């Protein structure tokens, strides 16, 4: 408890320091006056709007480990001009193929060396880019990782995933020991990644959003493990994003109620897959009382077609009503084959939008 109080105090002092710096200078927030680390910190200072709009888009990189993975992240950051480095790691070894609910008890925690290749990627990215940009690894939910380690390692393996989901639905409480083991491993990774140079984490919550596991199953079975990752990230790191992943599910306005008590500096919600009337970015910022990351549909037809004019029109509509403290992004990862040169032009347009569109 004492450590959590100290961590909270530390984070408050960091944000206060940013606010002090912001107040000292009368110049606009631009990448000429501050580096991208400072510009992102300024989003957390809710005493003033951020007139520089940071941007975050990400993809699923083909190369997962080694120097190729490091270079893929560097190339994406430098080519697209996004404002922080999101480190993705999506491969988890199969621990135990699950064919019945009796098999859940055989799921054990990962060996520490499982994470070493990923930690090396973080160390190298910190060395190459840490002086100018925040290093923010993605941490996937215990549920997602459990499904992968139980036999559906690839997200494209829909049949495998469906089979495991059906086993879970037979007796959701039976997966608790397996969730405990996986969560323990993910907590270990968060702590080690922080030591390796991570400035914070992109925590991907995945439970209440899945139609198979909404309501009581999420609250009673999944949430205690799901939230634990956000709690640990908040304990060890000052800049964390809570990504509420829709994963093909359908949200209602009540869906967010289960996430209001999660820690996290910034909220990255789904906005384009609602049942009934949805919430706006401003609504969500007010609901969570935090800055929001998002706005663009990651399945945007204009993005798929590479239509910059249409994309700028979408940006205009989003930013004119966006909350004061805001990072522009998408609901989730964009197309892997997105035109990166086009994306850079869009990112540059967004960065200065509030300065070029002043009322």
Predicted regions and their residues:
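Bacterial N-terminal signal peptides
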Residues: 11-22
